[in-house]
Amino acid sequence: MNDKVAATLVLVVTYSIVGASLWCLTYAWHDETKLYYWCIVQLLPVMLWVWCVISWCGAQLFGYAKRGKAD
């Protein structure tokens, strides 16, 4: 998969998540009990993205770590 296809795929997935979140908000706008589900729908992709970035940074740090001699 080349870079252009990967970037387009990420963009389409991101906009579909935003569109689904906005549709869910308009569906739950008049019922206050459903707004809790809106918060979950809105925050779950953000937390998954943060978790992925932190995991990737940790993997990069671990991969480039220099191994010292055992004392």
Curated annotation (Swiss-Prot):
Q: List all membrane-crossing ranges.
A: 5-25, 35-55
| Biological pathway | Glycolipid biosynthesis; glycosylphosphatidylinositol-anchor biosynthesis
Question: Which biological process terms from the Gene Ontology are attached to this UniProt entry?
Answer: GPI anchor biosynthetic process
Q: What are the protein's UniProt keywords?
A: Endoplasmic reticulum, GPI-anchor biosynthesis, Membrane, Transmembrane, Transmembrane helix
Q: How does it sit in the membrane?
A: Multi-pass membrane protein
User: Could you tell me where this protein is found in the cell?
Assistant: Endoplasmic reticulum membrane
**Primary location recorded for the protein, binned into one broad class:** endoplasmic reticulum
Q: Which GO terms describe its cellular component?
A: endoplasmic reticulum membrane
Q: How does it assemble?
A: Interacts with GPI2, suggesting that it is a component of the GPI-GnT complex, probably composed of GPI1, GPI2, GPI3, GPI15, and ERI1.
Q: What is the stated purpose of this protein?
A: Probable component of the GPI-GlcNAc transferase (GPI-GnT) complex in the endoplasmic reticulum, a complex that catalyzes transfer of GlcNAc from UDP-GlcNAc to an acceptor phosphatidylinositol, the first step in the production of GPI-anchors for cell surface proteins.
Protein's recorded name? Phosphatidylinositol N-acetylglucosaminyltransferase ERI1 subunit
Source organism per entry reads Eremothecium gossypii (strain ATCC 10895 / CBS 109.51 / FGSC 9923 / NRRL Y-1056)
Name the gene behind this protein. Answer: ERI1
